[in-house]
């Protein structure tokens, strides 16, 4: 046993000895029980835990001396299971593998044992995420999704000279192919897959983000006897996503990209059987310029991070904190809402704060039948019959090709590409946009769906031309909309609810205010004033839902401090003002409760 092994044993021994001594401080630790719900569907031997120790504690100091890349064999025991220290993360948490663990009940026992150590800040299962796409008819059609009636109108922006030039977008996905329509727009990336069997390239983390294929044989990835988990061919998912964002254009070959003047950083986090939460968030953070121990720093920080991936359950502690760190670096994080035809609050990372969650639409401007929906979806983009870059290989790469896919995975890169177009337009006039400003522009300049949708997909379909007009201050050139009543900007009419609503663990609650004496449809400056009493506001997601069903995320600082109290002012355009406005608050973790004490709207 080398020194690293000895130190690793000492770190986990603190956990075990605390449990034996009866020093139960679980109330001070966050235990994410929900993260264990899908363990029975994972491949055998794949269960890992993320353990974050409180800063300055002996356990935290012990982790700081660990290697981030080398898996260390050891004989550690936790609740009767052998555990192996894997590495530390960009958050400073430790990853521990428990190969013999098989059930949710066993995972709860292990987490409770770990949480009994007073040094522990939170513990959760290192969940697996998967690409959010499904194969579709590979025959060639027009790329309607760029310029059709319900496309993103990228062609109108290209005609004005904005192509995403000078902007860097990272694609956190399955890696990248050697492809004639991609190579010219690729920057150096990295492979963050820490599991050698999943990586398929003979090692773990390295500087080669090449896609080795994510194919698998019958039930290699768990889920027996579910026929959906039978063998699958390689998806070339990351390359399809990258091609939508920035395929080389005007080269007489293949397809175009939304922001073909931008550059892409490929970050490989998904391999055979998906990828771990901890690898995904490390890759995300690194791509935006964050430092990860054991990995060379990225010299081309991304302004937009595309993550067309996800898994079941609410946002994890690890995901939310790494998302916040990435956003603080100045990157907008664009997420696929998911393909389960369910409320997006039930999947991650679309259920996290500080992300832009994207649903999928059809060529007719309707919700794609597979697309997730609900208050967590901020806007939509084309997600069916999307033509982009792939390979003909069913296992490993064989020859460059093109094919159509469907999914919210295909919708998200349209938004990432449009975000790059908007940033390049802002750069042309010396304007710098924060992630929240960029998100706001994309959400409030969307074009309309084709009639009323069966389920909510946010504000509308992303509109590149209208978004660029907004950042340039040329609203008169935005895409026309139906006539609306004149703007309302009185600023002196207050609507208030003093009905107290309890906030309980892992649930969403709502409170409504009825507005009857404003224009039916119009534009307004609205001040939302909140009085939410809660012990840890980092665990809350807050949204305001208009009578039309449009969702306005209410961003707060995300700090681990109590209460959300005070005003937030924002503008709405062509919005339905009459009807019931709904405040929705979602509790994302166990251990803390509170209440909506009151809230008000001022028009």
From Swiss-Prot:
Domain P/Homo B: 478-603
Keyword terms of this UniProt record: Disulfide bond, Hydrolase, Protease, Secreted, Serine protease, Signal, Zymogen
GO molecular function: serine-type endopeptidase activity
Signal peptide positions (record): 1-21
Region (Disordered): 197-221
Compartments, as annotated in UniProt: Secreted
Disulfide bonds: 221-273, 315-352
Prodomain positions: 22-132, 477-603
GO biological process, one term: proteolysis
InterPro entries, sorted: Galactose-bd-like_sf, P_dom, Peptidase_S8/S53_dom, Peptidase_S8/S53_dom_sf, Peptidase_S8_Asp-AS, Peptidase_S8_His-AS, Peptidase_S8_Ser-AS, Peptidase_S8_subtilisin-like
GO cellular component assignments: extracellular region
Catalytic residues as annotated in Swiss-Prot or TrEMBL: 173, 237, 409
Cytoplasm is among the record's keywords: no
EC identifiers of the protein: 3.4.21.-
Limits of the Peptidase S8 domain: 143-468
Main location: secreted
Pfam families per the UniProt record, alphabetical: P_proprotein, Peptidase_S8
Family designation: Belongs to the peptidase S8 family.
Protein name as it appears in the record: Extracellular basic protease
The species this protein was found in: Dichelobacter nodosus
């Amino acid at each position: 046993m080398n020194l690293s092994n000895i130190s690793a044993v000492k770190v986990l021994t603190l956990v075990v000895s605390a449990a034996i001594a009866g020093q139960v401080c679980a109330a001070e630790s966050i235990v994410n029980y929900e993260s264990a719900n899908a363990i029975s569907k994972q491949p055998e031997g794949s269960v890992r835990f993320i353990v974050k120790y409180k800063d300055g504690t002996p356990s935290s100091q012990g982790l700081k001396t660990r290697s981030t890349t080398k898996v260390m064999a050891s004989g550690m025991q936790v609740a009767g299971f052998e555990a192996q220290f894997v590495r530390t993360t960009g958050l400073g948490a430790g990853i521990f593998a428990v190969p013999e663990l098989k059930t949710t009940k066993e995972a709860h026992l292990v987490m409770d044992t770990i949480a009994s150590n007073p040094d522990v800040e939170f513990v959760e299962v290192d969940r697996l995420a998967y690409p959010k796409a499904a194969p579709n008819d590979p025959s060639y059609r027009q790329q309607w999704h760029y310029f059709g009636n319900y496309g993103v109108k990228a062609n109108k922006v290209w005609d004005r000279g904005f192509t995403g030039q000078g902007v860097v977008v990272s694609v956190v996905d399955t890696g990248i192919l050697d492809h004639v329509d991609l190579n010219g727009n690729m920057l150096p990336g990295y492979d963050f897959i820490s599991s050698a069997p999943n990586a398929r390239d003979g090692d773990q983390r390295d500087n080669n983000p090449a896609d080795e294929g994510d194919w698998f044989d019958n039930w290699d990835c768990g889920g027996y006897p579910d026929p959906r988990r039978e063998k699958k061919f390689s998806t070339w998912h990351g390359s399809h996503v990258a091609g939508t964002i920035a395929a080389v254009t005007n080269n007489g070959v293949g397809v175009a990209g939304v922001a073909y003047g931008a550059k892409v950083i490929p970050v490989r986090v998904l391999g055979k059987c998906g990828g771990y939460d901890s690898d995904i968030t490390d890759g995300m953070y690194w791509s935006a310029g964050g430092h990860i121990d054991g990995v060379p720093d990225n010299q081309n920080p991304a302004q937009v991070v595309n993550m067309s991936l996800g898994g079941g359950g609410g946002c994890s502690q690890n995901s939310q904190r790494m998302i916040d760190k990435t956003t603080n670096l100045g990157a907008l994080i664009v997420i696929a809402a998911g393909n389960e035809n369910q409320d997006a609050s039930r999947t991650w990372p679309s259920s996290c704060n500080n992300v832009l969650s994207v649903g999928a639409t059809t060529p007719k401007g309707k919700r794609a039948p597979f697309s997730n929906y609900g208050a967590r979806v901020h806007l939509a983009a084309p997600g069916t019959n999307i033509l982009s870059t792939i390979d003909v290989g069913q296992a490993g790469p064989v020859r460059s090709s093109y094919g159509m896919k469907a999914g919210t995975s295909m919708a998200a890169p349209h938004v990432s590409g449009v975000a790059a177009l908007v940033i390049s337009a802002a750069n042309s006039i010396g304007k710098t946009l924060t992630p929240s400003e960029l998100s706001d522009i994309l959400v409030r300049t969307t074009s309309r769906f084709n009639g009323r949708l069966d389920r909510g997909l946010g504000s509308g379909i992303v509109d590149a031309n209208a978004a660029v007009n907004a950042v340039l201050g040329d609203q008169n050139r935005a895409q026309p909309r139906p006539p609306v009543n004149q703007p309302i900007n009185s600023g002196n009419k207050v609507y208030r609810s003093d009905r107290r609503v309890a906030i309980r663990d892992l649930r969403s609650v709502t409170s409504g205010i009825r507005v009857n004496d404003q224009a039916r449809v119009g534009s307004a400056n609205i001040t939302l004033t909140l009085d939410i009493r809660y012990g840890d506001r980092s665990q809350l997601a807050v949204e305001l839902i208009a009578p039309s069903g449009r969702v306005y995320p209410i961003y707060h600082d995300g700090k681990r401090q109590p209460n959300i109290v005070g005003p937030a002012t924002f503008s709405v355009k062509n919005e339905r003002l009459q009807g019931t406005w709904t405040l929705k608050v979602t509790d994302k973790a166990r251990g803390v409760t509170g209440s909506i004490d009151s809230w008000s709207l001022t028009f």
